[in-house]
Regions:
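Active-site metal-coordination/substrate-binding segment of hydrolases
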Residues: 79-146, 152, 164-169, 429-437, ...
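Acidic/His- and Gly-rich active-site-bordering loop/insert found
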Residues: 2-112, 134-138
Length: 459
């Protein structure tokens, strides 16, 4: 580690914190497109704030039609990329700190996006500033990309590639874990829909739950028509309230990142398993029973596949039931499932679709992100591991994860930081936060990694 570079980064801490507060205070959840704002007003406003920060720090920026932008330092024919993103998942419920106030308490800055991924973006920006201000020689250009659609469909990077965006020779995204992520499971986001025709005394009138496909839902509710005098059973985690003509049923769970649904408690699954006990009739009964039997609260998709799909490198397939919507005429669900790095889409997707179609459901949408795997001996992986080990003294091996990052979207890129072993995992959850000491430490590691990759000989 370069002592002078580390000291220069540490001296920038007050500016880093202030910059991060500015970005966190900009809610940046994707919304319907507007003219010149493909991801909606809020995402565009946060992007504008990031570009303003760059200009205030003396960087020139490039804006690719408001889909993605970047700042850059250095010269040379080749480019090293650092890919971060400014968009966030919806805030959801259960916060003790306002999700967009960027409050600091106990050495931590709280807010949606603070760790995923605005904090790492700010750390990367000030790493570039320290390198530039010290005049450290670089044999390659270094480009910090500001992504705007990572949490949903990666349309930012897809647009970048489709419109001639330069491909890096080396790069990383600070949107994962240390020491380094050299494998990412394949990801399938799928939605399914079914029509309902209800005529009985018990009817499902409305159902809703979840905030995003890649978040374990902590709340779900349904409204039912019920015969006069009918009563509903008590159940743990379920609240029943009488309403005109029937009942409202609410279920609570525990939120978690959709790549680790086993770490949460799925409120949608709890709700549907409860509804499955009620005397619904016809299509509604069949649809609810299918969901309870084949999905329920199973975080591994074993019920859908009939077996557990797993490997030694990355563990079992995960299956997060992230969203449900419906009324008296239809139901719609969205799944986010992730298959192991040594396996293929064909090992799981056809079986999932067949199970739904056999029960009368139709595939309503699908987005697939391929798996990723780089052996530990590749130059990119070994160089970044060297930087991390020099900074921390930790010789832990690289790891495979269920999370999906920008590393899947561009070649020669892996996820590197920002989470250290033992750090609280708060992304996509209430009270998301970043430790400010970790913010500075990340900026120091990123700065040294940039210098390493920009000067790394390649055959």
């Amino acid at each position: 580690m370069d002592k002078k570079l580390n000291e220069a980064v540490a001296a920038l801490r007050p500016q880093m914190v202030a910059a991060l507060q500015r970005l966190v205070r900009r809610r940046s959840v994707e919304a319907d497109p507007l003219p010149g704002k493909p991801f909606g007003e809020e995402v565009d406003a946060c992007f504008a704030e990031a570009l303003t920060l760059c200009h205030e720090l003396g960087f020139e920026t490039t804006d690719m039609d408001r889909y993605i932008g970047w700042c850059e330092i250095g010269t040379g024919d080749e480019m090293v990329a650092v890919l971060g993103h400014l968009d966030v998942v919806p805030e959801g419920e259960g916060w003790h700190h306002p999700p967009y106030a960027a409050e600091i308490e106990g050495g931590r800055l709280y807010g949606r996006g603070s760790i995923d991924d605005k904090g790492p973006v700010v750390a990367s920006l000030f790493a570039l500033k320290a390198i530039r201000d010290l005049g450290i020689p670089l044999n390659r250009r270094v480009r910090l990309l500001f992504g705007l659609n990572e949490e949903t469909n990666d349309r930012d990077v897809l647009y970048y590639k489709a419109h001639g965006g330069e491909i890096p020779v080396l790069g990383f995204t600070p949107d994962g874990e240390y020491p380094l992520i050299n494998g990412e499971k394949g990801i399938l986001n799928e939605s399914y829909a079914v029509q309902l025709h209800q005529t009985g005394a018990w009817q499902l009138d409305r159902v809703q739950g979840g905030v995003a496909g890649n978040v374990v839902p902590d709340y779900a509710c349904a409204a039912l028509t019920a015969p006069a005098g009918a009563s509903l059973p008590d159940a743990e985690h379920i609240t029943v309230t009488a309403i005109p003509g029937g009942y409202q049923v609410e279920a609570v769970g525990v939120s978690a990142h959709g790549s680790h649904p086993e770490q949460g408690e799925n409120a949608i699954g709890r709700l549907v398993c409860y509804l499955d006990q009620l005397p619904l009739e016809g299509d509604a009964k069949q649809a609810v029973h299918f969901l309870a039997e084949k999905l329920g609260t199973d975080p591994y998709g074993e019920r859908l596949l009939g077996h557990r799909l797993e490997d030694a490198l990355s563990g079992p397939m995960s299956c997060n039931w992230g969203l449900i919507e419906g009324d008296a005429q239809h139901l719609w669900v969205k799944l986010n499932y992730r298959y192991p790095v040594t396996m293929e889409r064909a090992d799981c997707q056809p079986a999932v679709q067949t199970a739904f179609e056999a029960a009368g459901w139709a595939l309503d949408g699908q987005v697939h992100k391929e798996k990723l795997y780089y052996p530990a001996e590749t130059p990119l992986v070994s160089a970044l591991l060297e930087v991390y080990r020099d900074a921390t003294g930790d010789n832990a091996p690289p790891k495979c994860i269920g999370g999906g990052t920008y590393a899947k979207m561009l070649p020669n890129v892996v996820a590197f930081g920002p989470l250290f072993a033992g750090d609280p995992v708060t992304e996509h959850q209430p009270d998301e936060c970043i430790d400010l000491e970790r913010l500075v430490q990340n900026a120091q590691i990123i700065a040294n990694a940039i210098v390493k990759l920009a000067n790394l000989p390649l055959e």
